[in-house]
Amino acid sequence: MPLSYQHFRKLLLLDDGTEAGPLEEELPRLADADLHRRVAEDLNLGNLNVSIPWTHKVGNFTGLYSSTVPIFNPEWQTPSFPKIHLQEDIINRCQQFVGPLTVNEKRRLKLIMPARFYPTHTKYLPLDKGIKPYYPDQVVNHYFQTRHYLHTLWKAGILYKRETTRSASFCGSPYSWEQELQHGRLVIKTSQRHGDESFCSQSSGILSRSSVGPCIRSQLKQSRLGLQPRQGRLASSQPSRSGSIRAKAHPSTRRYFGVEPSGSGHIDHSVNNSSSCLHQSAVRKAAYSHLSTSKRQSSSGHAVEFHCLPPNSAGSQSQGSVSSCWWLQFRNSKPCSEYCLSHLVNLREDWGPCDEHGEHHIRIPRTPARVTGGVFLVDKNPHNTAESRLVVDFSQFSRGISRVSWPKFAVPNLQSLTNLLSSNLSWLSLDVSAAFYHIPLHPAAMPHLLIGSSGLSRYVARLSSNSRINNNQYGTMQNLHDSCSRQLYVSLMLLYKTYGWKLHLYSHPIVLGFRKIPMGVGLSPFLLAQFTSAICSVVRRAFPHCLAFSYMDDVVLGAKSVQHRESLYTAVTNFLLSLGIHLNPNKTKRWGYSLNFMGYIIGSWGTLPQDHIVQKIKHCFRKLPVNRPIDWKVCQRIVGLLGFAAPFTQCGYPALMPLYACIQAKQAFTFSPTYKAFLSKQYMNLYPVARQRPGLCQVFADATPTGWGLAIGHQRMRGTFVAPLPIHTAELLAACFARSRSGAKLIGTDNSVVLSRKYTSFPWLLGCTANWILRGTSFVYVPSALNPADDPSRGRLGLSRPLLRLPFQPTTGRTSLYAVSPSVPSHLPVRVHFASPLHVAWRPP
């Protein structure tokens, strides 16, 4: 190691022709402030203020000023989502599989059954902001593709659909916490003179279109009379369990959401038995206003269910409802031009329902007809531009007044990963389909995670310059044709080929809430990490001779032989499927003995970055300009890439410290040819990070500000510094001397900074050199009172403390992998016992 030191001096142009002396003399000089100033001038590192214009692009790296323009693909396919339903009794199923669970495993699984999200503040945005105008040239295409994506998610049971202020519907299998509206249900039966049996007999939608008015009015009268004694303060403080409705007869301006507003004016909830109220839009509005009123005013703990709903209420529209539907109004209107939407609407007789309802209706907390985040579509990933991915912007929960501090969770660092996974096992990785959408969310979180759209008419009206949105006129015949245009007509005709009758369905407004955890919230990665780590922990204990490990949705399995790995794969796959976890068998990758994981290649020899990252680094250096100031935001991107591979270089992170300093000062950075050559040489030769081995520590180092001491076996050494040094610097130098003189890869020290192996806070040149010398060295903490090198460092060689026998055990970080399992009783009486093909149980190295 010390031989490389001269090379280091030459590289940084520090040699002035004189031969370098011994390490004990030369190394302390690297902490000298004067030398650092001289080097900074030579390498042009200290010149932060520059007058030349900054460079904002280096290769593919750009600053925030010139972000890449997103490309819309009209041919995007909406990915299909399996009917994901994680089993509610997941803890019991795991216990049947492996016996009693550890406290850690239980705690993690309870966290996600169901997940909860309660921010302190939630900002509600108008529905117009539901779908972001991310592609200004493809507004209509983007609108329908996004609506189709949302519809697909709803059909797959990933979203709730807001039906009224206090009820929602969804598809798929319900969980026990999703309170189906049965206990406080309202099955409205009317007297025979109205000719109606009940709401259940109606075919289209929640309420019948034709005979709603009188039925509701008589019901309102009954429920109002029935609840009279309980009104007032008592009623609000002691909710009744009867399930009847405490509905005050007050005019409500709320409307059922999902139906276009009409210009028919205000509906009075007067209580009478008149059956003459047959104007359809008024009837619909009365019906839905009654619904939201009953929810809002219900004194029971539950809301109302019309429980004879067909799963998809997709009947043909009754004639009367046309007046309230923007889309169907075109049918009876005179075409305004050859590009009038009435030509499209008249193409088919049956446009299907204005609205669809889920298989189950549940009670939810009060949810406004608003959104809390916008959505837009992008390519699924850089390698798959054929499929789209939905981006949900819930950034309000990461900034400002509604900021939520997300829980921290342990991410395995490089050394822990290497200690754990660098072995002679044969590996495969599993692909979990839509991993985030496995974890159910409590319905109480729905009002905080709302997405949706205001409907095509309003969306187009907002974006077109010639239309006026006026609450009184909106939806009336006068401005119906304001949205007609050649561009809209052509777009809709093309989309009609793709979506058919669904164009009508998608043109209506909708509000959706998340039923499974969304990707755009900081809580989701935490929950996913807890979930997969708990499952892998169970798998590891069920198969102690194998290894299962996960980070987020990336799950890897390792076994001693290929045959054993395949049988493990079958058993684990069956177990995961029984829990309701969906795997994508086509994307299962068999890696052999070199595992590709988290951007690394991990083999028995250690860990290296994957090839595509190495190629990116080479490309970055090819494009890196010299003597030109580079925007600090671009420097952030460069440091992100180089920082990932820094542990594999000789000088490590300290080599990047000048770049870090410029980013912190928010100043441009100018690469000098020498500094670029130095970095380039560092990154062209990458060295693997090796697995740490357990062992006994027999080499100890200690220092005081004025001197250093070593204990190598029974040998003691000491030395003094030319000038007093800061204690951390002195301790680091002592550790370097111990490594250099003994060659030991295990050194005992009492300094926490040296133990941390983070040398970025030391003088730059010293940090680089120390990283070079101490690369691959493990440290053991020894208290000062017991440190055999303590006396030599204070100049006392005569006294000899007994040499400690300090064992070193490599750490696997906070991944809680090998907690000792509780004693497991014989939980499977008919279990088949067979000898493992390995004969010996594998333990972590």
UniProtKB/Swiss-Prot annotation:
GO terms for molecular function: DNA binding; DNA-directed DNA polymerase activity; metal ion binding; RNA-directed DNA polymerase activity; RNA-DNA hybrid ribonuclease activity. The record marks Y65 as: Priming of reverse-transcription by covalently linking the first nucleotide of the (-)DNA. Residues 180-348 are annotated as: Spacer. Mg(2+) binds at D431, D553, D554. Its EC number is 2.7.7.7, 2.7.7.49, 3.1.26.4. Pfam families: DNA_pol_viral_C (PF00336), DNA_pol_viral_N (PF00242), RVT_1 (PF00078). Keywords: DNA replication, DNA-binding, DNA-directed DNA polymerase, Endonuclease, Host-virus interaction, Hydrolase, Inhibition of host innate immune response by virus, Inhibition of host RLR pathway by virus, Magnesium, Metal-binding, Multifunctional enzyme, Nuclease, Nucleotidyltransferase, RNA-directed DNA polymerase, Transferase, Viral immunoevasion. Residues 1-179 are annotated as: Terminal protein domain (TP). Residues 349-692 are annotated as: Polymerase/reverse transcriptase domain (RT). Multifunctional enzyme that converts the viral RNA genome into dsDNA in viral cytoplasmic capsids. This enzyme displays a DNA polymerase activity that can copy either DNA or RNA templates, and a ribonuclease H (RNase H) activity that cleaves the RNA strand of RNA-DNA heteroduplexes in a partially processive 3'- to 5'-endonucleasic mode. Neo-synthesized pregenomic RNA (pgRNA) are encapsidated together with the P protein, and reverse-transcribed inside the nucleocapsid. This is Protein P. The lineage of its organism: Viruses, Riboviria, Pararnavirae, Artverviricota, Revtraviricetes. The gene is P.
